[in-house]
Swiss-Prot record:
It is found in: Cytoplasm. It catalyses: tRNA(Glu) + L-glutamate + ATP = L-glutamyl-tRNA(Glu) + AMP + diphosphate. The gene is gltX. It is an enzyme of class 6 (ligase). A motif ('HIGH' region) lies at residues 12-22. Monomer. Its EC number is 6.1.1.17. It comes from Mycobacterium sp. (strain KMS). Catalyzes the attachment of glutamate to tRNA(Glu) in a two-step reaction: glutamate is first activated by ATP to form Glu-AMP and then transferred to the acceptor end of tRNA(Glu). This is Glutamate--tRNA ligase. Belongs to the class-I aminoacyl-tRNA synthetase family. Glutamate--tRNA ligase type 1 subfamily. GO terms for molecular function: ATP binding; glutamate-tRNA ligase activity; tRNA binding; zinc ion binding. Disulfide bonds: none annotated. HAMAP family: Glu_tRNA_synth_type1.
């Protein structure tokens, strides 16, 4: 399939919440399609009605939309190989099954699990070896007898009795030995098609040229290659796609990151205030890199450089601190206007209200852009602007609002009450004169009590700008309250 235009697919099952490992797979497929000028197909594998949910499907759509991973064909937009939901393709699978049986590539198997185990035991083999290919050569009479007993067959593919080898784009030449893979089931006993059938059949019918997926699916590859070869022989497939098995994503210790690990939940990162650029940059580093000496890059730069053959086969560890640091870098790379818009949308989504007008909010955003790791950090720095959210941090007050803060705050109040235009420059001038010149205080001793009294915390945006945003009346009221707190602590 090397001479064909690249067609890749992202085909999740709609169960649970999107996992960062799943999204890493989507990103690598998307980037490879965009790098090669190929097609990114989005397909939903929803044949398990007991586990699949519409809510999970919508969550996957939400994730792709938020991250900007646009697809060229899929369930919401259609395409030449629609439908793109497996639950709507059952007639196609039934037709393929019938053709495989008619060509002798697949057969009806009636053995129960108990019968298979009994045959293994009788032959002195491990009873847990799995299916023993017993039904391969049943006669028509034997099949009729089983049906008369009320048995429903599963359909199994006749596996080739030879090694199966392929050149994995990530792992190199990979071989599974002859006899290690028994004939496998394509359907359940009720005729429902299994993943083992529908996934390769859809790839064949949708002309997928490259399969980029997690290494947990590596053991299923020889079976799928055998099925592709059978599909070629019956005229359903044009060829066998190339495979690239992406490295596992590990959590704490050496365990694979699971859905139970909080950092695996894509939406928890969004709720904290990750921006798409930061999260995608980090996910790209889970198995790939743009250069040995460079970790920060844009999505466009990734697309220009990405080739799946450069993906590392070693497991990648999810490092939350590194992810946070990269997100902070991407927040700093946003223009002031773009950052303001992102922060406003984040605050609105989380019910945070600073009470500022647009111009004031833009100024507040400018003050915190270089001081945060995730958008959620900004509320911790700006919530002092909301009277309902303002609280005096006990530790900060115990440190800064002691008896020696009373004369500092008295002098600050006296200086600020004489300020005409309540601007950053005027506030700075008044406070520096009152505290640094007149009282001859060091800056930390001078401004620490003011910061805690005005913002409630020892860490805040720049002090003079914060007082301007807070406004004259509220600033003076907070300093008076801080002065009373210090006096009471004396």
């Amino acid at each position: 399939m090397n001479d064909m235009a690249v067609r890749v697919r992202f085909c999740p099952s709609p169960t649970g919440t999107p996992h960062v490992g799943l999204i890493r797979t989507a990103l690598f497929n998307w980037a490879y399609a965009r790098h090669t000028g190929g097609t990114f197909v989005f397909r939903i594998e929803d044949t398990d009605s007991a586990r699949d949910s519409e809510e999970s499907y919508q969550a996957i759509l939400d994730a792709l939309n938020w991250l900007g991973l646009d697809y060229d064909e899929g369930p919401e937009i259609g395409g030449p190989y629609a439908p793109y939901r497996q639950s709507q393709r059952r007639d196609l699978y039934r037709d393929v099954i019938d053709r495989l049986i008619a060509a002798g590539e697949a057969y009806e198997a009636y053995s129960t699990a108990e019968e298979v185990e009994a045959r293994h035991l009788a032959a002195g083999r491990n009873p847990k070896l799995g299916y023993d290919n017993f039904d391969r050569d049943l006669t028509d009479e034997q099949r009729a007898a089983h049906r008369a007993e009320g048995r429903n067959p599963v359909i199994r593919l006749r596996m080739p009795e030879r090694d199966i080898t392929w050149r994995d784009l990530v792992r190199g030449e990979t071989t599974f030995g002859a006899g290690t893979m028994p004939d496998f089931a394509l359907t359940r006993g009720n005729g429902e098609p299994l993943y083992t059938l529908v996934n390769p059949v859809d790839d064949a019918l949708m002309k997928i040229t490259h399969v980029l997926r997690g290494e947990d699916l590596l053991p299923s590859t020889p079976r799928q290659i055998a099925l592709y070869e059978a599909l070629i022989r019956i005229g359903v497939a044009d060829g066998v796609p190339e495979f690239a098995h992406l490295p596992s994503v590990l959590g704490d210790g050496n365990k694979k990151l699971s859905k139970r690990d909080p950092q695996s939940n894509l939406f928890l990162h969004r709720d904290r205030g990750f921006i798409p650029e930061g999260l995608l940059n980090y996910l790209a580093l889970l198995g790939w890199g743009i250069a040995d000496d460079r970790d920060v890059f844009s999505l466009d730069e990734m697309v220009a450089a990405f080739d799946v053959v450069d993906v590392n086969s070693n497991p990648a560890r999810f490092d939350q601190k590194k992810a946070d640091a990269l997100n902070a870098e991407h927040i700093r790379l946003l223009s002031e206007d773009e950052f303001t818009a992102r922060l406003k949308a984040y605050f609105a989504a989380h019910g945070h209200d600073t009470g500022l007008d647009d111009a004031q909010f833009a100024e507040a955003a400018r003050l915190v852009q270089t001081r945060i790791v995730v958008l959620g950090d900004a509320w911790g720095l700006l919530k002092f602007l909301d009277e309902g959210a303002f609280v005096l941090d006990e530790k900060a007050a115990a440190k800064e609002l002691k008896a020696d803060a009373v004369p500092v705050l008295d002098a600050a109040l006296a200086g600020l009450e004489g300020v005409g235009q309540w601007t950053t420059g005027a506030i700075e001038e008044a406070l520096k004169k009152a505290l640094l010149e007149d009282l001859e205080l060091k800056p930390r001793k001078a401004f620490g009590p003011i910061r805690v009294a005005a913002t409630g915390a020892s860490v805040s945006p720049p002090l003079f700008e914060s007082l301007e945003l807070l406004g004259r009346d509220r600033s003076l009221a907070r300093l008076r309250a801080g002065r009373d707190h210090a006096a009471a602590a004396a």
